C-alpha cells in the first residue's frame, strides 16, 4: 500500500519480471502475469481528487495500461516510440546470428494462475493459462533487400521464419524441468550459410499475453 499526496490505499502491483535466488543453479528469472484492474480502479478514485488538468495525465495512463500484463523475457530490443502507436510493435525480436542452431535447452517451472482473464478483465470460466518458451531463426533481409525485424505483430506468422524450437508440454511443473528441443524447419525453408539471420528467444508467463489474456 502507498500514499499518493494523502490518498491512501493505492494498490501497487508486483513486478511481472523479477530475479530469484532459487534457480536450478544460481539465479532465475520469475515471470508472472499480473492483474492490473485493482490498480486501475484506485487510479480512477484518485483522479476524482485532482484538478481537470492533472486528471488528463491519469486518463493517459489508464488508456495505456491493460487489465492484465504478462511477464516476458526476449532476445531483442524495445522501442518505446513504436509502442506508443502500437504496443505490439514495441517488442522487436532477435539479434544478428551466425550459424545454424541445432537445439534449444534450459530449465523451467510453471504454475498457471487460478483465474483466466480476457482483455476486458472478465474471468473466462474453464480456461487454463499456458506459458510459452521458444526460439526462432529468421531471415534478416527481406525480398526487397531491406532489414527485417519481427515484432509482436508477426513473430509467430512471418514468412521469414526458417527454424523454430518450442516447449510444447505446457502443463504445470512444480519442480525444475529440463527441456532440450531440436530446431525444426518452417515455411519450407532451408538454412543457407550465405544468408543473414537473426535469432529470437521468447519466454512469457501467458502465451496470449500479447492479446492481454492470461491468468
Range-by-range predicted roles:
Residues 1-105, 126-206, 210-215:
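Aromatic (Trp/Tyr/Phe) and Gly/Pro-enriched flexible surface segments
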Residues 108-123:
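Short amphipathic, basic-aromatic surface patches that mediate peripheral association
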Amino acid at each position: 500500500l502507498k500514499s499518493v499526496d494523502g490518498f491512501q490505499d493505492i494498490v501497487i502491483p508486483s513486478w511481472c519480471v523479477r530475479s530469484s535466488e532459487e534457480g536450478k543453479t544460481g539465479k532465475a528469472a520469475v515471470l508472472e502475469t499480473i492483474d492490473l484492474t485493482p490498480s486501475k480502479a484506485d487510479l480512477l478514485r484518485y483522479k476524482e481528487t485532482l484538478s481537470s488538468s492533472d486528471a488528463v495525465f491519469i486518463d493517459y495512463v489508464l488508456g495505456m495500461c491493460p487489465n492484465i500484463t504478462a511477464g516476458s523475457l526476449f532476445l531483442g530490443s524495445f522501442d518505446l516510440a513504436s509502442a506508443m502507436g502500437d504496443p505490439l510493435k514495441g517488442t522487436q525480436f532477435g539479434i544478428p546470428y551466425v550459424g545454424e542452431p541445432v537445439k534449444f535447452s534450459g530449465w523451467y517451472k510453471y504454475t498457471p494462475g487460478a483465474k483466466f482473464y480476457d482483455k476486458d478483465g472478465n474471468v473466462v470460466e474453464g480456461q487454463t493459462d499456458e506459458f510459452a518458451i521458444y526460439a526462432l531463426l529468421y531471415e534478416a533481409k527481406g525480398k526487397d533487400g531491406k532489414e527485417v525485424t519481427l515484432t509482436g505483430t508477426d513473430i509467430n506468422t512471418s514468412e521469414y521464419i526458417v527454424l523454430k524450437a518450442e516447449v510444447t508440454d505446457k502443463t504445470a511443473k512444480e519442480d525444475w524441468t529440463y527441456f532440450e528441443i531440436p530446431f525444426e524447419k518452417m515455411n519450407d525453408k532451408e538454412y543457407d550459410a550465405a544468408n543473414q539471420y537473426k535469432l529470437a528467444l521468447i519466454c512469457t508467463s501467458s502465451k496470449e499475453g500479447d492479446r492481454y489474456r492470461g491468468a
